Each structure stands twice: as structure tokens, then as C-alpha cells.
Amino acid sequence: MPKCDYCDVYLTHDSMSVRKAHNSGRNHLRNVVDYYQQIGHEKAQSVIDSITSSYAAEGQSSSNPMLHNPAAATPFPPFPPANFPGGVPPPFPPASGPGGMPFPPPGARGFPMPPLPGQPGAPPMPPFPGMPAGMPFPPPGGLPPNFQFPIPPPGGFPGMPPPGQGFPGMPPPGGNHDERR
């Protein structure tokens, strides 16, 4: 069991967390201050220098004993693949793509991505707001030059209720005046 040099107390075990907890304690800090006040300035400086040099020398070999040291570690043997005899079976059956289509095997090309809107072969885009449903779609290059969007009616966008009225199914402005409570 390690012993604190300043407190004459045995620590429960030698770990960084135990030392850190002990070193931040009120009694330990008071004992450290008392120790250095008793030995005087000259001796205190030499003790501090020796402690610092021992930590520096120790830090060159291993700065933090809790960190992983790759040179000292022994590698674990790799697990055999799931399809290899003696390999670990997969924890669940192979997943499938949308609509129950199985995913392609590794290394094979998957299903092609659908084209983005506006590309050849893509489904047509819905009509713009305010345009009748039967209007032809703009050409693939975009809208014709100087295209004028329809002007919305006064009070907002098409399909919106006139100003001052609630949406359908909503109580009128000013609250619910139902007297059946």
C-alpha cells in the first residue's frame, strides 16, 4: 500500500484516481504547506527540484501510466470472418433493401440511384403555386426568359383564407364563445 509522504497516511491502493482524490483533500494541502514551511526555503527548493527531475525522468519513459502503451501491448488474434468455418455467426439475418430486395454482395455494384428532379428520366415536378394543374411543365432548361409568375390575390397566397378569418375548423378570432360549459 502506498503511503503519502506528507500525511503519514496509507492510501487504499496505488492508482491515479486515489492519489488525485487524496492530493486535493484539505488535510493533505495543509500538511504540504506545513512541511515546506518547517524545512526552510533552501531545503524546500532542493526537494522541489528533486521531485520535478524525478517526474521529468519518469515522464520521458511513460508520461501517463494510465495511457495505452502500444509497445507493451500484445495484440489479440483477429476473429475469423462470419462466412469462414469456425467463424462467429452473424447476430441477425442479413438485412435487405427497400421492398425486400437483398443488398448486393460486397464488391458488387448496387442499384442505381434515381435521377434528381430536373434530370432526364426523373418524374415531373408538381405545378408551381398559382398555376393551373393542366399547364405544361417548363422545358428542361428551366423557365423561359421573362417568365411572369401569376400575381397572388389580395390578402395572401392562393388558397389562404381572407385576412381576419381563421382556418377552417378553427374557432373565430377572440376565442370560443360556447355557452354550454
From Swiss-Prot:
Highest taxon, organism lineage: Eukaryota
Gene Ontology biological process: mRNA 5'-splice site recognition; spliceosomal snRNP assembly
Keyword vocabulary terms for this entry: Metal-binding, Nucleus, Ribonucleoprotein, RNA-binding, Zinc, Zinc-finger
Main location: nucleus
Region (Disordered) residue spans: 129-181
Zinc fingers classed as Matrin-type: ranges: 2-34
Gene Ontology MF terms in the entry: mRNA binding; pre-mRNA 5'-splice site binding; U1 snRNA binding; zinc ion binding
Compartments reported by the entry: Nucleus
Feature: compositional bias, Pro residues: 129-143, 150-174
InterPro entries: Matrin/U1-C_Znf_C2H2, Matrin/U1-like-C_Znf_C2H2, U1-CZ_Znf_C2H2, U1_snRNP-C, Znf_C2H2_sf
Gene Ontology CC terms, in alphabetical order: commitment complex; U1 snRNP; U2-type prespliceosome
Subunit structure: U1 snRNP is composed of the 7 core Sm proteins B/B', D1, D2, D3, E, F and G that assemble in a heptameric protein ring on the Sm site of the small nuclear RNA to form the core snRNP, and at least 3 U1 snRNP-specific proteins U1-70K, U1-A and U1-C. U1-C interacts with U1 snRNA and the 5' splice-site region of the pre-mRNA.
Assigned protein family: Belongs to the U1 small nuclear ribonucleoprotein C family.
PANTHER family tied to this protein: U1 SMALL NUCLEAR RIBONUCLEOPROTEIN C (PTHR31148:SF1)
Function: Component of the spliceosomal U1 snRNP, which is essential for recognition of the pre-mRNA 5' splice-site and the subsequent assembly of the spliceosome. U1-C is directly involved in initial 5' splice-site recognition for both constitutive and regulated alternative splicing. The interaction with the 5' splice-site seems to precede base-pairing between the pre-mRNA and the U1 snRNA. Stimulates commitment or early (E) complex formation by stabilizing the base pairing of the 5' end of the U1 snRNA and the 5' splice-site region.
Name of the protein in its database record: U1 small nuclear ribonucleoprotein C
Organism in which the protein naturally occurs: Sclerotinia sclerotiorum (strain ATCC 18683 / 1980 / Ss-1)
Organism placement in taxonomy: Eukaryota, Fungi, Dikarya, Ascomycota, Pezizomycotina
